């Protein structure tokens, strides 16, 4: 990618904003070396990786990247035998903790069902060095000091030091509090000079205390003397401090050697967390600019929906739909210089550069972008003073370079093509240059104010005109891109609004040919028509989204209602079975009691006693069944029953569907989610009218709700989606649908492939195919049922 292209499209400014979201110098280093890729597979993977990080941010709000620092140079020094300082070792421990914490964070999310395959692969490379981490933190405190507990020897030495210091202070403080001290001392304090305890003695009393003079005041009137009585104590203290220093060095060398042993693992972990910092910086930046993941294709076309420039405040910028590469390969944006054409040009360029860098781009969902091997841009006034080149010459130098390198894998951006010279010659050159790059198969967006290029857009098959809308009432551009409508100068309208007389304007119109006036009027009508069409489309789109939302809500309520009903039915059946079981047990108890009475001949069971026992037995029948008891006399179905018929199960008052006959008098019946055996005498045949193909929805046999002709799986997890497909196909078959549609979206294709793999194995599927253009294309699978 040309450095000049990155500069004029302000790629580095995007990187500067991205830098603000890194958590460490490791991530910042990755951002500084970021350049757009030209490898399709790599770009797709980078986009998927950024998308996973964005998912983590949506679910968790942030990622635990704190405490990570660039420790690579310290680890390399440890490998060659240098002793690391306490702070350097502490940085290594903190980074090891940070990498371990990040690994646990991602793995916990995965364990909780969040799909993060790429991030999971990244953190799987992190090797926990918990033992080394704890050794360092056990020896070095948060402030970077080696703690007493680092070794028993160090603890003992420091105990000696504290004892010696206490004895010295005690002796010196007694001296400063003596009656003679007031006249002999400059101040009643104990201080330190050259790491030895001293007191401030006046010059004239230097011989009173004996000992060693370590320092004097600026005036020379005060001497800092170590009295003779504490010289030996100070010597002992210094010896203890030397031992302390030696023990600290031994501990630091020991820890450094431990780091050296694990150096390769530590460096590998650092590289992983550097990548994670970089990845999450891209995700945080996407959130900041309200960007989305584009669909990356290798078919050389782009479809940017509501595209915005990332460096312009999203509250003031006007988003635009920009398509290139399908119906046309070149867009020529015409109109006055004040219309924001250059912003549109730069928006296309920077979106492509960002996408090829793995960054999400400021567009709406489902936007598509392709991969270009080269991006060329001739934008702005970059005349060279050193080379004494004019504006025109400077542009032409760039254009010559572009024409030498552009091919069918290139995106070429021209700003004010042909400007800076005679208008007629400039327009002619612009047309020839556009022809040249178009013939090479490049994708081109060019801006110009030459009216001759309006005709060029109509005369070339792969070229389309466009313009940036201008509001003559406010005398300012709206920055709305109108594809298919060439630009107008609006000079007469602007002049009139600014107060120029009608007489002068009319005279000016007379100097313009009739054909030109007709063209301008035609363009004005095209602008108005397009604005009206776009307004109508936006209103229709809003209504469609509202309808879809209502439809989803109704479907949710229906599903909840039926799930609740089925749950209650299942609960009622379970309670009924429990009551029947209890009745059987009580009946067995009654019978056993009668047998024992007879066997023991304790009681002569008479008729009235048997009647009473029978009454008790009947009284144990389930209350549910008794309440729902129906007179089945004459209710046995008169019509010959067949599998698939719809019946009413009288015991439960529910509709069901006959599955198969299991005996002469019993059928297997599907009631909602339940399958049970039911006697023919407990059924009532239902004569259901045939469904017509014109109806949008149909009743599912045996159920009290409707099934849609479409199943929308977009946004579903894979496992949940497959369960919904299975249930939906069963319901659709029960409803006798000949054909249904499953909406899975385009996306990465994983869900689409999963649906079609399932359809291959389903016994009820006769055939399936992708949707036609009017049915949703590759985002929909149309299923034909048996």
From Swiss-Prot:
Keywords: ATP-binding, DNA-binding, Endonuclease, Hydrolase, Nuclease, Nucleotide-binding, RNA-binding, rRNA-binding. InterPro entries: DNA_mismatch_repair_MutS_C (IPR000432), DNA_mismatch_repair_MutS_core (IPR007696), DNA_mismatch_repair_MutS_sf (IPR036187), MSSS (IPR046893), MutS (IPR045076), MutS2 (IPR005747), P-loop_NTPase (IPR027417), Smr_dom (IPR002625). One of its GO terms (molecular function) is mismatched DNA binding. SUPFAM superfamilies: DNA repair protein MutS, domain III, P-loop containing nucleoside triphosphate hydrolases, SMR domain-like. One of its GO terms (biological process) is negative regulation of DNA recombination. It holds the Pfam family MutS_V. PROSITE patterns: DNA_MISMATCH_REPAIR_2, SMR. Its EC number is 3.1.-.-, 3.6.4.-. The keyword Secreted does not apply. It is an enzyme of class 3 (hydrolase). ATP binds at residues 335-342. The keyword rRNA-binding applies. Residues 711-786 form the Smr domain. Homodimer. Binds to stalled ribosomes, contacting rRNA. Endonuclease that is involved in the suppression of homologous recombination and thus may have a key role in the control of bacterial genetic diversity. NCBIfam families: mutS2. HAMAP family: MutS2. This is Endonuclease MutS2. It comes from Bacillus cereus (strain G9842).
